[in-house]
């Protein structure tokens, strides 16, 4: 019984290490998003850190339009990054979890 517990504890530690490694890797995964007309471009990591914002000079003439573009485009980029992040972290966690009877449906 204690051997099984130690095995499960080791598996949990491995799963935690795998999740941490995945988080670090997601710092290098870039997500690009742009406004519908391409005048605003944003690049963020899958961990939702902004890396670059490119604004066409045409947008500098209208502050309200620029603000709207920033909000919409940032939200789309964050949504994409969050989907990637959750899928990758979830897969890493699920892959490393020990087989515990009755827990099958919790990590889907």
From Swiss-Prot:
PANTHER family: NUCLEOID-ASSOCIATED PROTEIN YBAB. It is found in: Cytoplasm, Nucleoid. SUPFAM superfamilies: YbaB-like (SSF82607). Homodimer. Binds to DNA and alters its conformation. May be involved in regulation of gene expression, nucleoid organization and DNA protection. It comes from the Bacteria. Keywords: Cytoplasm, DNA-binding. This is Nucleoid-associated protein GFO_1796. GO terms for cellular component: bacterial nucleoid; cytosol. HAMAP family: DNA_YbaB_EbfC. GO terms for molecular function: DNA binding. Gene3D superfamilies: Nucleoid-associated protein YbaB-like domain (3.30.1310.10). The lineage of its organism: Bacteria, Pseudomonadati, Bacteroidota, Flavobacteriia, Flavobacteriales. Belongs to the YbaB/EbfC family.
């Amino acid at each position: 019984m204690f051997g099984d517990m130690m095995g499960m504890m080791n598996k949990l530690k491995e799963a935690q290490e795998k999740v941490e490694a995945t988080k670090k890797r997601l710092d290098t995964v870039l997500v690009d998003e742009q406004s519908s007309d391409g005048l605003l471009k944003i690049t963020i990591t899958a961990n939702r850190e902004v890396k670059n914002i490119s604004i066409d000079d045409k947008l500098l003439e209208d502050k309200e339009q620029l603000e709207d573009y920033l909000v919409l485009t940032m939200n789309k980029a964050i949504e994409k990054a969050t989907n990637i992040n959750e899928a990758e972290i979830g897969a890493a966690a699920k892959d490393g979890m020990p087989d515990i009877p009755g827990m099958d449906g919790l990590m889907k």
